[in-house]
A protein has these predicted regions:
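Phosphate-binding/catalytic loops
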Residues: 85, 91-151
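Helix N-cap/beta->alpha junction signal
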Residues: 16, 90-91
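Conserved active-site segments centered on acidic
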Residues: 1-82, 148-151
Length: 151
């Protein structure tokens, strides 16, 4: 049975979808695709149906990250049971995850940066900072740490 990881951010057009694609790339590179399944979702409804934000897409392409035909979606309460880990990017994500999913009774909701050497850091939203390269680097670092922790 595979480990199921759900990445979460505000709109599901920058950070969480990048984490999904970066994590899947790392899993494939290590020959572990049969052991993991990653997905992504938003806490908000603002961007539902929209593709990856073009500057974030550009950053992923520049780093040779395989990307698919993504459409933003909102996380559903039922997904708490469907995933082994639910990974947020910042405090706001965690707040709204709590409102949507309810109590984290199984301890499966974590910050992505918990898996790095800066566990108290957050991954800032590049929609606002306009720093898509920094977002990519932080997400890459977090995904690498997460995969190392799980293998």
């Amino acid at each position: 049975m595979s480990i199921r990881v759900l990445f979460i951010c505000h709109g599901n057009i920058c950070r969480s979808v990048s984490a999904e694609y970066i994590f899947n790339m790392m899993v494939a590179e290590r020959g572990l695709s049969d052991r993991f399944r990653a997905d992504s979702a938003a806490t908000s409804t603002e961007e539902i149906g929209n593709p990856i934000y073009p500057p974030m897409r550009k950053a992923l392409i520049q780093h040779n990250v395989p990307i698919g035909d993504h459409r933003a979606r909102q996380v559903r309460r039922s997904e708490y049971e469907d995933f082994d880990l639910i990974i947020g990017m910042d405090e706001e994500n965690m707040y709204y995850l709590g409102r949507i999913l309810g109590e984290d009774r199984d301890g499966k909701i974590k910050y992505l940066m918990e898996y790095t050497d800066t566990p108290d850091a957050e991954i800032e939203d590049p929609w606002y900072t306009r720093n898509f390269e920094k977002a990519y680097q932080d997400i890459y670092k977090g995904c690498k740490g997460l995969l190392n922790e799980l293998t």
